[in-house]
Amino acid sequence: MAKKILYQDNARRALERGMEIMVEAVSVTLGPKGRNVVLEKSYGSPQIVNDGVTIAKEIKLLDHIENTGVSLIRQAASKTNDVAGDGTTTATVLAYAMVKEGLKNVAAGANPISIKLGMEKASQYLVTQINEFAQPVEDIQSIQQVASISAGNDEIIGSLIADALSKVGKEGVISLEEGKGIVTELEITEGMKLEKGFISPYFITNTEKMEVSYDNPYILLTDKRITLVQQDLLPILEQITKTKRPLLIIAEDVEKEALATLILNKLRGIINVVAVRAPGFGELRKQMLEDIAILTGGTVITQDAGLSLDNIQLNLLGQARRIIVNKDSTTIVSDGQTLNEINIRCEQLRKQVNIADTGYEKEKLQDRIAKLSGGIAVIRVGAVTETEMKDKKLRLEDAINATRAAVEEGIVPGGGATLTHLSENLVTWAKNNLKEDELIGAMIISRAILAPLRRIAENAGINGPVIIEKVQQQEFEIGYNAAKNTFGNMYTEGIVDPAKVTRSGLQNATSIASMILTTECIIVDDVKSSNES
């Protein structure tokens, strides 16, 4: 296929046009008075969302060059979502504001490489400032505030997540399920999270989240390597196929031939299966498999017990209410049938902790106790329609991620107030520490970081620049409450953002924007020539 090549300002402007289209679609959701976006689906009913990264993933333009701009800015949203789990809309708005400001200066003759250096130095300065101003999250009220803001000012969701975290702890697992009624409920159930993910991405059932999710599965536990399905697994697979239930295999390893056979059976729809390597090493691996067996009511297939894979029955397999497997971890939600056995096992492990010889042994035993007894918080999402259900689930996911981020790195004033206040600090610092085009780069950042507050105000129907000026005249804690159209202390009003979300959004936006500003040429497929041919 022939290629289309654009140089210099033409290239950068084409990228900017694509970015602008996407930012307009995403930024309407920003703030308490942000609107929703309707996404057409190739199957099923349209989806109504208020989540930046979900909207960003749906946008694809006809013009290949403009679409490249969309893809680049989408990276800022996706990376922020991967690191912090929230703040995707803010990252998108920031990246575009930086590009827009930067292009003016590049067109006027400033050196893009020096601008990039200045932007990076300014970003590093702002990150240290954010960390300095961040307040630790210690009480349940702060957790509730963060969760409520992230869920679109939904206080009910906020209190649910705060309740869930207080019950399962900071490291605990919170799982989302579709409820049967219209009320969203919280349930604490037995369960375990393993630090091992699927062996192959071909097992994925949900491509949007890149995860495997099955209800009511059988669980096969073994400390052996599975080499050939025909030799090792065929009898038990035939039994499971008759039940039409999915299967989770946790083994030392699944070798290429066996893995290929399992994937083929999954893709053909013969059996829903996912394979995971057993966690730990050596003796610890066997002990952890025993723990999983107790949780799921199964038996570990091991030669020590005189068991082999080729002659096992269904009664030796474990069972669970639900499993969720991604590339890094496996979450098993128990069906609650083995509560008594779990308590006995935990008591045995506690006794072993008391007589353990080394600190390492104690640490591993305590880790196993925590995994067995910690439990999993299951939030059953209730809604009137399926469309509302999907929107609620996205909001809950954002809120859970934001809350974890807040516990990790603390909170800062929300509603764009933190970056607005730091803009003036940055100007002072840059004038004292940078010069020439590097100073211009820092000034680009200082103006761009006002964009989130401006957009929040505009979405509420208020003049953005006026709000920015008023906020900058106040103390650091004071910001703009768009929901009430008032100014006040962001901490006492509960309008707070996780420092990690603000930090990662800023860093990813700076990274993408500085790369675009240093672009001198774009090469894309020429659609016209391909159509003619």
Curated annotation (Swiss-Prot):
Keyword Oxidoreductase in record: no
Protein's UniProt name: Chaperonin GroEL, chloroplastic
SUPFAM superfamilies for this protein: GroEL apical domain-like, GroEL equatorial domain-like, GroEL-intermediate domain like
PROSITE patterns linked: CHAPERONINS_CPN60
MF-aspect GO terms: ATP binding; ATP-dependent protein folding chaperone; isomerase activity; unfolded protein binding
Annotated EC: 5.6.1.7
Gene Ontology CC annotations of this record: chloroplast
PANTHER family the record matches: 60 KDA HEAT SHOCK PROTEIN, MITOCHONDRIAL (PTHR45633)
Function in brief: Together with its co-chaperonin GroES, plays an essential role in assisting protein folding. The GroEL-GroES system forms a nano-cage that allows encapsulation of the non-native substrate proteins and provides a physical environment optimized to promote and accelerate protein folding.
NCBIfam families according to UniProt: GroEL (TIGR02348), PRK00013.1 (NF000592), PRK12849.1 (NF009487), PRK12850.1 (NF009488), PRK12851.1 (NF009489)
Species name: Phaeodactylum tricornutum (strain CCAP 1055/1)
